[in-house]
Amino acid sequence: MELEAVLKERTAAAGDPGRVLGAWVRSGWSAAGPSVLESEGGSGGPLAFESTSSRILELASKDNEPEYEALPDGSNVTTHMLAGAVAGVMEHCLMYPVDCVKTRMQSLQPDPAARYRNVMDALSKIVRTEGFWRPLRGLNVTATGAGPAHALYFACYEKLKKTLSDIIHPGGNSHIANGTDYSCPA
């Protein structure tokens, strides 16, 4: 089961020999037929198993997946700061109306005949009675502060991640380093 998962995760292309090998392993070793094993110089005995197991280990040890949670290798501090600022401002702009409604709902006393049934109902009633811009009131100050804050956070995070990864696991990525530097800037 775990071997199948490793083979499936580590191979990206549909025509990759690892997928063919994985299908052969899942089918019970005999799907290739004795003629294939004999043509490779074996009779299906320990030699065939050793070559297959070494091929499986080779495929499993390849790390050909790109790092999807990072900017390209040539990125500098300015790029990280810009990415952080844009991400922070966008996050606050999208979530601010929901946060406004959440705050409004939390300030009300719990009552079976409540004024709002859910978040969408509350948002629509606020917009209808108080105007379209009411849930966005104060967003400009929040977005202005979010840009620099998230820019510094992202830049510090990436710098610490690289520094700690080089110390803990030189030349690679370390989950311990990522978790440690996640808690530092906060």
Swiss-Prot record:
Fetch the InterPro entries from UniProt.
Mitochondrial_sb/sol_carrier, Mt_carrier_dom_sf
**Which reaction is the catalytic activity of this chain?**
Fe(2+)(in) = Fe(2+)(out)
In the record, what terms sit under GO molecular function? ferrous iron transmembrane transporter activity
For the keyword Cell membrane, the answer is: no
User: In the UniProt record, does the keyword Mitochondrion occur?
Assistant: yes
Principal localization reads mitochondrion
Each Solcar repeat, start to end: 75-163
Question: Where do the TM regions start and end?
Answer: 77-96, 137-157, 172-185
Q: Where in the cell is it found?
A: Mitochondrion inner membrane
- GO CC annotation: mitochondrial inner membrane
Question: Membrane topology for this entry?
Answer: Multi-pass membrane protein
Superkingdom, taxonomy of origin: Eukaryota
Q: Keywords of this protein's UniProt record, alphabetized?
A: Ion transport, Iron, Iron transport, Membrane, Mitochondrion, Mitochondrion inner membrane, Transmembrane, Transmembrane helix, Transport
GO:BP terms for this protein? Answer: iron import into the mitochondrion
Q: Which family does it belong to?
A: Belongs to the mitochondrial carrier (TC 2.A.29) family.
Q: What does this protein do?
A: Mitochondrial iron transporter that mediates iron uptake. Probably required for heme synthesis of hemoproteins and Fe-S cluster assembly in non-erythroid cells.
What is this protein's name?
Answer: Mitoferrin-2A
> Which source organism?
Xenopus laevis
Which gene name does the record give? slc25a28-a
